[in-house]
Amino acid sequence: SSSPMTLSELDLDTIASKGITPERLQQQLDRLATGFPYLELSGSATVGHGIIALSAEEQCQAIDRWQQYLADGGEACKFVPASGAASRMFKSLFSFLDGADDVPAPGSDVAAVIDNITRFAFFPALDDITRTVYNKSVEQLVEDHRFKDIIAAIITEKGLNYGNLPKGMLQFHSYPEDGCSRTPVEEQIAEGTATAVRPSGTLHLHFTVSPAHRALFEAKLAEAIPAAEARAGVKIEASLS
């Protein structure tokens, strides 16, 4: 149990205004000190067990209702929560970079990254970075067993800096036929042009972002929106909060 609280009259008035008793507040503080139990999962969600699947006819009906809503002047805005940082995705890569071992353990996340390095959408950008920073291609670094240099080029500031970027800024999907890749932000824009364009021909997008990353999103949107407008033949208006 955490040490007993000392509450002022103002504290007591404040918690009382929120419907919280001193005893309840102490219980909450104790919980923060002792931690929370893990949830017990009863199984995976599947169709018929937590997931509802629409039939082909129901899908068509839903699409028709949506299209009719838009045709009748209904307002649509694609809302995208985009404040998530990518740092947790790269936890095992940071651990390897900071660790004593220079070779990733067989079967580890880092080994899987190295084994599949050419399959990532960001591989061309990574290869450019390693040629600039190390004067070697990624594949040459693999041959030289310079695995930490490769990982550093992915997650640190001297490379792609993915360990410090929001998830929305990572090159995520590859489009070989177009010779490009898309970030999640660009995919959200593309999805919006297919699903949420108003009869006026305008797509409204709203992204919630971390204040620390706002400038990054503004720059990406300024770059991505004109290309998406030309591709889809629509006007795109985006806002951030």
Regions flagged by a language model, labelled:
Residues P4-V47:
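N-terminal regions that are enriched for targeting/export leaders
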Residues I15, P37, L41-M89, F94-S241:
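Domain-scale recognition of functional cores that engage charged ligands
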